[in-house]
Every structure is written in C-alpha cells, then in structure tokens.
Amino acid sequence: GEEEDVERARLAVTVVAEYADAVRRAGTPMPAGEERLLLDQVTAELVGLGRLQTLLVDTSIEEVHILGCDRVRITRHGGGVDWGEPIADSDAELVEILQAAARRAGATERSLSTSKPTLDLQLPDGSRLAAVFLVSQRPYAVIRKHNTLDVSLDDLAGARADLDEMIDPLLRDFLRASMRAGLNIMVAGLAGAGKTTVIRALMGEIPPDEPFVLLEESRELLPTQHGGRHRAVMSFEAREGHGERGLDGRPAGEVSIADLIPVSLRMGVLRIIVGEVRSREIVPMLQAMTTSRGSMCTIHARTPAGVGERIIELALSHGREMTVDQARRMAGNALDLIVYVTVEDETAIGGRKHRFVSHVEEVIGVGDGNRITTTAVFGPGPDGRAVPRHLPERIRDQLLRVGYDARLLSRWVEAGAGAWRRPRNSRLARR
C-alpha cells in the first residue's frame, strides 16, 4: 500500500545515508551526484518497480517499449527514439517487476499470472502500463507516460510553450462555451493522438464543486491530481474477473464499464465521463447521454469520417438485439459534438510528431438513408489544423444561453482562416 511505500522510501534514505557516511569516514567520500543516483536506485528496488522507476521520473520520455529484459526502446517528446539500459537482469526478473506493479495497482485487483497473462494498469506516477507474457516470445510491456496531468484549454491554445498548440483561440472559446452549455462530446482519434490530453483540458471547464462520475478501465485521467480542482468527482475503475467463468461467459468478480454506467446514473450527477469506449459499453454510454448533459467519452477511429461506423461497430457487439439503424438513431440523439484529434508523424523524414484538433463536427441527427448527419463547424485549414467552416445549427441556442454567439465566427468562416498563434513547422510544408 501507499503507507508501506512511504516506509520503504524512508528506509532507502536511511540506508544510503549510512553507507555514504561510512565511505566518507573511510576517506573516499561519494560525489553528491552518485549519492543521489544510488538513492534513486535503492528506492526503486525497495518500492518494487526496480529500474522502471528511472524511466518514470524522466519527464523527457513519452513512451517506453520493453521487449524483454534487455531491449528498451524509448520514445521522447517530439518523436526522438533511443535505446535504454536493460530493465532487469533476466526475463524472469522482468516478470517479477511487472507482477509487483500489479500488486500495487490500487483499489481494483490486477494480476499477471499463468491464468492471466495480460496486464493493464496505472502506475503510481499516473503512467499507463500494458504487459503480456507466456503467450508472447518474451515478456513485453509498454508504458505510456502522462507528464502533462494539469492542462487547460488555454494551455492547448498556445499559452504553454512546452505543449503542442492543439487548438486556436477561436476553437478554445467554442469548446469552453460547449462545456458551459452541457453539450455531449465524443473525442476521437488514433492511439497516441492526444485524446486524453484534450479530454483533460475539457474536464478543466467543469465547475470545481459540480459532482460528476468518471469511469475508466484503468485510471488515466487522474481528476484528483488535475490541479486539485475537482472536489466532487466520483471515480470508478473497472475490475478484472478471475477464476472460472459463469453462465454468462464472464469470469467471476468482473465489473465492466458497461456494468458501472447504470450505477452512475443513480449517483445524482448530470455528467458521466468514460475514459474510452472500446466495446459493448458504448450502448449504455449513449443511452446515458440521452438523459444527461455535458457527458464525454473518447473513441479510437482512423479518420473523422470513420467515427460513425466505429460507433456502429462497437454498438453491434452489445448483443443480437442491437441493429445498425438502432445504433445510428442512438448516436444521432445522444451526441452533440465529435472532436477529432489528428497526429501526423514526421519523424521518418527528420521531423517530429504534430498533434492538433483537425475537425469539430456538430451532430445534427439521423438523415436520409438513416445515416448520422453532421456539420463541420471546424475543419482542416491549409496546414491541416482546424479553422471555422460552418456556423452551428442545432446547438446554436444552447450556446447563446451561456453567452456565446456563434455568429462571431462568420468572418472567419468567410475568410477560411483560423487564429493559430504559432506556425506548425511541418517539414512537408517546407519542401
């Protein structure tokens, strides 16, 4: 537990201090840098994450691929790649480290074992860890770090030089008003595009005393660390099942996101936020959105045009009673906005990764042919980043009620331009 970790960390300080004092008395004092490094290593071993800890404290790292104990591929912010030192002395030791991480995974039970050879959890620093062994050639793990826990729409609009400018001030003001108006928003994009960052910034617009429910497979959005501003959030985490499967085919003790959504509706909140919809939980999520306001979720989709079909694909996994037409009507009634986040990776040509919002689609409803109908309120400009395209229709009055007049975008729509503060600096644009 957390108290045990604190005690182990104190023990590490004591042990290293006594060792440093002993070598000092022997006439060979340790340089301050070496003493600090030794303390980091001893703390990491005692707390249970071993050499993983040195990767977690390095804020320049974005993602780590552990391909066995001795192959550690490190991706840094901006897309640079290098190879790190071995993470363990053997694959068996690596598995022990991963199992130790699973035991410290917080309130919900996680394990990595012969009966459960995959693992998905949040590490103490907020990073996301996925691991697999036995069914793979060697033990593999991926760590996605979250160095930016406290982020606002202002930050995404260029207020912080250390972050990508993902939106411009026009889109910032539109999204801020959309949150005040209680619109239901789906944030879509590829893995690693920045969906979590965008939804964190949107969460920052929720009043600090407003109760809302946050549902995640493993905790990633971290509202309690989100600047400390969300005092009334109720955070739920799915629980993996273990042992024999019941008559419904599910392992004993499993509690899924789909199970938790009906519970959330009884918690007296207007907003429900699902970290990611990836399966049958999309149906209860959309059902909840039809009776709530200001709810949000993220979804994986390759293209903006593919979001609707992705929704249908997931909805059909809910059961035989769900049809394509039902899924479309449900999405058309539940969603107000779809925000698409794009990532363009230019590292192969000596550039970097660029992350930005490229589309904001207003969901109008279900139109001819029973298709989900949308209007591009913001769409790609000359460099791919979102600029105003059309004035919103269905949500216009809701925005007006919170003091946002969308007609302010008219001149920008006519000009086909946005208000981005910094150039994108794409290598492709310079060719």
Regions found by a protein language model. Name each.
Residues G1-L112:
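N-terminal accessory targeting/assembly segments
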Residues T75-A181:
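P-loop NTP-binding catalytic core
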Residues M179, L190-A191:
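The conserved Walker
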Residues L183-I185, A201-G332:
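Switch/coupling sub-region of P-loop NTPases
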Residues K195:
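Conserved lysine of the Walker
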Residues I349-R431:
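NTP-binding/hydrolysis catalytic cores, primarily Walker-type P-loop NTPases
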